[in-house]
C-alpha cells in the first residue's frame, strides 16, 4: 500500500532503496526482495477483506459506475504472452482493442469507492450489475454511460430500488429525462477522474507482472492506497429535505 502512494514507479527500487534503507525501524524482520515477492500472495485475502470491510465508502443515494481496461501487454505481443495465457482476454474500450482485464468500479459523489470487481477483458460492462454482491447496499440513482443501456437491466434494477441513468441514444423514442438527471450525467466525469488517479498515481495498471497472484495483490494495494488518499475528486451536491415526505 505504501508503494502505491510513494511516487516510485518500480516496486523493486522502492523496496531496496526506501524500505531496506530508511524503514527498517518499522519492519525489523525484513526479508530479501525475492522472498518478499514470494510472500505477497499470502496477503491477498486479508487485504481484500480489509478493503471491503474498512476502506470502502457508503452509498449516499447518488452513485457512478464505470469500467476501465487493465492491459497486461501490447497488442503485438498477445500471441507470445505467457503469464496470463488462458486467463486474460481480448476486449474493446473507447480507446480501441486491448488484451487483459477490466476493473469495474462504483463510487459516490465524494469520490469514495463503494465496490469493485475484476473480470476478463471480453466481459460486458453490464454483467457485474447482475451480481448481487456488486450492487449490494446501493440505492437511489446510478449514473453510467451508454455501454450500460439495456431494458432488462433497467427494469431489474428499478425493482431493487435503483434508478439507472444513462445518456439517450438517437433511436430511443419517447424517453424523457429530468433536469437533475441531465446534470448528474454531466458530472459522470468524476469516476473517470477516479480511474485516472488509480492508473497514474496508484499504478493499478502496468505490464511487468510475472504471476497472476501478484497481479491481484497489485490491484488490491492500489485500491487500498486510493481509499486512503486524503483528497479525492468530488462534486458539490445540495440536498433538499422535503417535510411532505413525512406524511407518507
Walk through the language-model features, giving the residues of each:
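Short alpha-helical elements
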Residues: 1-248
Amino acid at each position: 500500500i505504501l508503494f502505491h502512494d510513494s511516487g516510485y514507479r518500480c516496486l523493486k527500487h522502492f523496496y531496496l532503496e526506501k524500505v531496506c534503507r530508511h524503514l527498517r525501524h518499522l519492519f525489523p524482520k525484513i526479508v530479501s526482495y525475492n522472498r518478499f515477492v514470494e510472500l505477497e500472495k499470502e496477503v491477498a485475502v486479508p487485504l481484500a477483506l480489509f478493503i471491503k470491510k474498512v476502506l470502502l465508502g457508503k452509498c449516499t443515494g447518488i452513485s457512478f459506475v464505470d469500467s476501465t481496461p487493465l492491459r497486461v501487454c501490447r497488442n503485438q505481443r498477445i500471441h507470445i504472452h505467457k503469464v496470463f495465457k488462458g486467463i486474460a482476454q481480448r476486449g474493446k474500450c473507447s480507446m480501441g482493442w486491448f488484451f487483459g482485464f477490466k476493473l469495474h468500479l462504483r463510487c459516490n459523489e465524494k469520490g469514495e469507492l463503494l465496490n469493485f470487481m475484476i473480470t476478463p477483458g471480453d466481459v460486458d460492462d453490464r454483467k457485474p450489475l447482475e451480481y448481487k454482491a456488486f450492487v449490494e447496499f446501493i440505492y437511489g440513482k446510478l449514473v453510467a454511460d451508454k455501454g450500460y443501456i439495456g431494458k432488462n437491466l433497467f427494469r431489474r434494477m428499478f425493482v431493487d430500488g435503483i434508478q439507472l441513468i444513462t445518456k439517450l441514444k438517437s433511436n430511443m423514442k419517447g424517453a424523457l429525462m429530468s433536469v437533475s438527471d441531465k446534470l448528474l450525467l454531466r458530472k459522470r466525469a468524476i469516476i473517470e477522474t477516479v480511474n485516472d488517479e488509480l492508473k497514474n498515481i496508484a499504478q493499478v495498471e502496468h505490464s511487468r507482472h510475472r504471476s497472476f497472484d501478484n497481479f491481484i495483490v497489485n490491484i488490491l494495494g492500489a485500491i487500498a492506497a486510493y481509499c486512503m488518499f486524503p483528497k479525492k475528486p468530488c462534486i458539490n451536491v445540495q440536498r433538499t429535505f422535503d417535510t411532505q415526505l413525512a406524511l407518507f
